[in-house]
Amino acid sequence: MVEFAFDIKHLFPQSIIRVQAHSLRPKVTQCRRYAQTERGKSTMTSCRLSEILNIMGKLSADAQGLCHAVTSADKLASDQVVYLMADKAAGHWEITGLLKVGTKDLFVFDQGGCYRRLNQTPAILDFYVHESRQRCGQGKLLFEWMLEKQGWSAHKCTVDRPSNKMLAFMAKHYGLVRTIPQGNNFVLYEGFFDDPITTCKSASGLQATGSGCRSRSQGHYVRQEQDQAQIKHGQANRNTVQNDANSGPFRQDQKIVVGTSIYRRRWKSPRTLARAGCREVSGGRRF
């Protein structure tokens, strides 16, 4: 458990509280309302919450072996929420856990390999429970509280850079084991796309049914619908050329006449003639 130099009892009307960015930005008028402690420091709630977030974020980063903290008061965005857990098992209130969530706009692959764009996707950004409270049901209680308040379900959440403990937590409590391989640091579990609500648009703005699919054998993206459309368009153009050539007074063996009648211009560049494999006869001379 994490102890602080100040009393946190008044910060926790219940065991789990919800902290957002606007609650960490005090106004000047608020600063005048609070008295000074015996140490001469402000007793503002926002300042204390900021200190709690910074310390808990540092502990979470150390537990995961990260060089920089994921959670801090300065980094908390307007679309992110931090859930703090505390208890008074030792006779006074102490912080025991932190859970940071938010929404992300992601480009992901579904189970069929199709490339999709997901807007406002639920994301687990940071999760930490103090070592003295692990394997006691505290993490599950904090996670369930978050799901209820956010209106999310576990299999619809993406996880940013999950640790081995986080993966084991999701497998133990929610049976989420099999993941969908992605090209970024987020983990998606199978079943994420089963609900029709998650039918999203592809990167091109079209419904991601066949376009933007990934070729597993070649390792790159194949625009199937676009390729098929181009093939059909090319076949139609060739059929038009053949019909025009066969219906005129000259046959296909006189290619230069066909090309001139279709495009209404003559090929005068020698480089173009060489590329097309044609020879133009002008004034009885060959070029």
Swiss-Prot record:
Keyword Thylakoid applies:
no
Q: What happens when the gene is disrupted?
A: Viable and fertile. Ovaries are normal 0-7 days post eclosion but show increasing levels of incomplete egg chamber and cyst separation in older animals. Reduced levels of alpha-tubulin acetylation in early syncytium cysts and up to stage 5 germline cysts during oogenesis, but no change in somatic cells. Leakage of cytoplasmic material from germline cells into somatic follicular cells, possibly due to a compromised plasma membrane barrier between these cells. This may aberrantly affect follicular cell fate, compromising egg chamber development.
Q: Name one GO biological process term.
A: microtubule cytoskeleton organization
Keyword Transferase (UniProt): yes
Sites binding acetyl-CoA sit at: 127-140, 163-172
Sorted alphabetically, the keyword list is: Acyltransferase, Transferase
- Localisation: Midbody, Midbody ring
Annotated InterPro entries:
Atat, GNAT_ATAT
| Record-listed E.C. numbers | 2.3.1.108
What is catalyzed by this enzyme?
L-lysyl-[alpha-tubulin] + acetyl-CoA = N(6)-acetyl-L-lysyl-[alpha-tubulin] + CoA + H(+)
Which parts of the sequence are marked as the site Crucial for catalytic activity?
Answer: Q64
The GO terms this record gives for MF are: tubulin N-acetyltransferase activity
Miscellaneous comment as given in the Swiss-Prot or TrEMBL entry = In the ovaries of mutant flies lacking expression of this protein the plasma membrane barrier between germline cells and surrounding somatic follicular cells is compromised, allowing cytoplasmic material to leak from one cell into the other, thus the name leaky.
Q: Which PANTHER family match?
A: ALPHA-TUBULIN N-ACETYLTRANSFERASE 1
Family (UniProt): Belongs to the acetyltransferase ATAT1 family.
User: Could you tell me what this protein does?
Assistant: Specifically acetylates 'Lys-40' in alpha-tubulin on the lumenal side of microtubules. Promotes microtubule destabilization and accelerates microtubule dynamics; this activity may be independent of acetylation activity. Acetylates alpha-tubulin with a slow enzymatic rate, due to a catalytic site that is not optimized for acetyl transfer. Enters the microtubule through each end and diffuses quickly throughout the lumen of microtubules.
Q: What is this protein called?
A: Alpha-tubulin N-acetyltransferase 2
Origin species, per record, is Drosophila melanogaster
User: What lineage does the source organism belong to?
Assistant: Eukaryota, Metazoa, Ecdysozoa, Arthropoda, Hexapoda
Gene name per UniProt: lky
